[in-house]
């Protein structure tokens, strides 16, 4: 039996492993298309600032083709380094595109103010055509409209510090778009705005350089549809992380934004580990979880073997990403979501509407948290040297805080409805005889003798109306502050007792009792 379990574990691990790369054949290359990437031909801030201005306007041009837009965005993303050309050549390894670097320098003869660097030949006309600037009269039209602040005509500056903060403001907006451009582009606007406000408050960006919605939508859509652009952005992030020593301020900002980008699309896998396994509740010992726990274990090993690109597998469209979806471990995922909802308020907005969601195991996770509140793990207690008295003290404190949190979350509990009872020294023969009541409404409820007898047990039929009114007043004083439902129940009980008294008197006198309508009595 032990060998069977060992073979099963090895089988599942082998099943989850991707095919290993072999040296028998060469790498498969696709049909490449050429991407033109513009880089500054000198170290002048004027050249970079003017190039940035022209590139930003090109992004918002609807006539720019997809490959050209990709090259423009790569140019903007690499402008913050000292040698953009060397950076691009070092990190680009894409089987779908071929990068062609073109240097630009200032020009007084071209309309756009830039030209392509060449040996003797004048390429001013080609530069104007590439940038889409045909004449000086279209300058205002081309330069305005892509910033929310309409008063800004252009973004050309001469100072290096001003250029860095301006470039950081534009780069921050592009990198923020990568976080949800693939996983949730339709609902990304709110989170993107929150992160923009964060960097504005930290003085990393300038709020006046916020791009308008049209410009941001164009960039987001291009990031979502172009895998080569995403490969470049991920490669740039990894290159920044690997670089030693102090990093430029823009590079540090990119690493900070990466905290929102990393593990995008892997929320189910990460949250299952966090709430399902790391909490170490005894429910993990269920037989139903044994197979899925082995699956999670093999996926964690696979995640480690993928290396530094593992957190970006969804952004990079790696085919192995499907193995990490919650459909591979539905019961454990449902249980983990129940645990997470009880432990963290932020989990309440998570979307659970999936076909493999199991409500039973979701409730299991919730109940596991509720019933384990205040309990101290014996393993952790022994590791941290916690005594039995200290563990008991912790349990008491946690129980009280949990009750306070539940009260604040659910609101005050409604008081129970209290009914009047007769004095205990009353004779037992004064109980009401069984009475049958039938509603005259079609399809109305029919109350049996036993039901009426149970609800009116202990009440006498000769209670005077004045005594009943006095009892009602006392009850109202004791129940002051309760909800209106309590008062309605008391009124209904009073009218039911009046009906009982009338029926009892009719039976005693031997007269035919008149027909009473329930609607009149209970109105």
Curated annotation (Swiss-Prot):
Q: Which intervals of the chain are annotated as region Disordered?
A: 423-442, 500-523
Please verify whether the record's keywords include Ribonucleoprotein: yes
Q: Which GO terms describe its molecular function?
A: RNA binding; structural molecule activity
Q: Where is this region: RNA packaging and organization of the helical nucleocapsid?
A: 1-375
* Predominant location: virion
Positions of the UniProt region annotated as Homomultimerization: 1-36, 373-391
Instruction: Spell out the subcellular localization from the entry.
Output: Virion; Host cytoplasm
Q: Is Translocase included in the keywords of this UniProt record?
A: no
Q: Which UniProt keywords apply?
A: Capsid protein, Helical capsid protein, Host cytoplasm, Ribonucleoprotein, RNA-binding, Viral nucleoprotein, Virion
Location of the region described as Interaction with the phosphoprotein in the Swiss-Prot/TrEMBL record: 477-503
Q: Where does RNA bind?
A: 180, 195, 202, 260, 351
Which stretches does UniProt call biased (Polar residues)?
Answer: 501-511
UniProt GO cellular component terms: helical viral capsid; host cell cytoplasm; ribonucleoprotein complex; viral nucleocapsid
* Role description: Forms the helical nucleocapsid (NC) in a ratio of 1 N per 6 ribonucleotides, protecting the genome from nucleases. The nucleocapsid (NC) has a helical structure with either 12.35 or 11.64 N per turn, approximately 20 nm in diameter, with a hollow central cavity approximately 5 nm in diameter. The encapsidated genomic RNA serves as template for transcription and replication; encapsidation by N is coupled to RNA synthesis. Forms the encapsidation complex with the phosphoprotein protein P. Before encapsidation, the newly synthesized free N protein, so-called N0, is chaperoned by P.
Describe the subunit structure. Homomultimer; forms the nucleocapsid. Binds to viral genomic RNA. N0 interacts (via Ncore) with the phosphoprotein (via N-terminus); this interaction allows P to chaperon N0 to avoid N polymerization before encapsidation. Interacts as N-RNA template with the phosphoprotein (via C-terminus); this interaction positions the polymerase on the template. Interacts with the phosphoprotein; this interaction leads to the formation of membraneless organelles that function as viral replication factories.
* Family note: Belongs to the paramyxoviruses nucleocapsid family.
- Protein name as annotated: Nucleoprotein
Instruction: State which gene encodes it.
Output: N
């Amino acid at each position: 039996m032990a060998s069977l379990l060992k073979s099963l574990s090895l089988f599942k691990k082998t099943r989850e492993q991707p095919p290993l790369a072999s040296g028998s054949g060469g790498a498969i290359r696709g049909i490449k298309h050429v991407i033109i990437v513009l880089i500054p031909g000198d170290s002048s801030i004027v050249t970079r600032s003017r190039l940035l201005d022209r590139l930003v306007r090109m992004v918002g041009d609807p006539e720019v083709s997809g490959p050209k837009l990709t090259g423009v965005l790569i140019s903007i993303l690499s402008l913050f380094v000292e040698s953009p050309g060397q950076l691009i050549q070092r990190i680009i390894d894409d089987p779908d595109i071929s990068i062609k670097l073109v240097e630009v320098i200032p020009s007084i003869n071209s309309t756009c103010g830039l030209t392509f660097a060449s040996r003797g030949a004048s390429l001013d006309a080609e530069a104007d055509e590439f940038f889409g600037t045909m004449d000086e009269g279209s300058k205002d039209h081309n330069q305005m409209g892509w910033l929310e602040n309409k008063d800004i005509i252009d973004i050309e500056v001469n100072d290096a510090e001003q250029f860095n903060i301006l470039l950081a403001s534009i780069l921050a907006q592009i990198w923020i778009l990568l976080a949800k451009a693939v996983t949730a582009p339709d609902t990304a606007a709110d989170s993107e705005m929150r992160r923009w406000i964060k960097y504005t408050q930290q003085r990393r960006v300038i709020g006046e350089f916020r791009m308008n919605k049209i410009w941001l939508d164009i960039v987001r859509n291009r990031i979502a549809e172009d895998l080569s652009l995403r490969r470049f952005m991920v490669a740039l992030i990894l290159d920044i992380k690997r670089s030693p020593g102090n990093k430029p301020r823009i590079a540090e900002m990119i690493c900070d934004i990466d905290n929102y980008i990393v593990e995008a699309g892997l929320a189910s896998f990460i949250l299952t580990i966090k709430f399902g396994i790391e909490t170490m509740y005894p429910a993990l010992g269920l037989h139903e979880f044994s197979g899925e726990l082995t699956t999670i274990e093999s996926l964690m090993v696979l995640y480690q073997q993928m290396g530094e690109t593992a957190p970006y597998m969804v952004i990079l469209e790696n085919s192995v990403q499907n193995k990490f979806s919650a459909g591979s471990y539905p019961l454990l995922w449902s249980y983990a979501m129940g645990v997470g909802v009880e432990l963290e308020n932020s989990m309440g907005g998570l979307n659970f509407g999936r076909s493999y969601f199991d409500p039973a195991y979701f409730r299991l996770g919730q109940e596991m948290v509720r019933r384990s509140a205040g309990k101290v793990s014996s393993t952790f207690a022994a590791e941290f040297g916690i005594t039995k008295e200290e563990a008991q003290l912790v349990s008491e404190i946690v129980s009280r805080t949990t009750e306070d949190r539940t009260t604040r979350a659910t609101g005050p509990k409604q008081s129970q409805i209290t009914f009047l009872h007769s004095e205990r020294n009353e004779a037992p023969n004064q109980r009401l005889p069984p009475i049958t009541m039938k509603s005259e409404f079609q399809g109305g409820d029919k109350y049996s003798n036993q039901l009426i007898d149970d609800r009116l047990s202990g009440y006498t039929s000769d209670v005077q109306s004045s005594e009943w009114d006095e009892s009602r007043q006392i009850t109202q004083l004791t129940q002051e502050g309760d909800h209106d439902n309590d008062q309605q129940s008391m009124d209904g009980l009073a009218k039911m007792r009046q009906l009982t008294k009338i029926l009892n008197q009719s039976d005693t006198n031997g007269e035919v009792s008149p027909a009473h309508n329930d609607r009149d009595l209970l109105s």
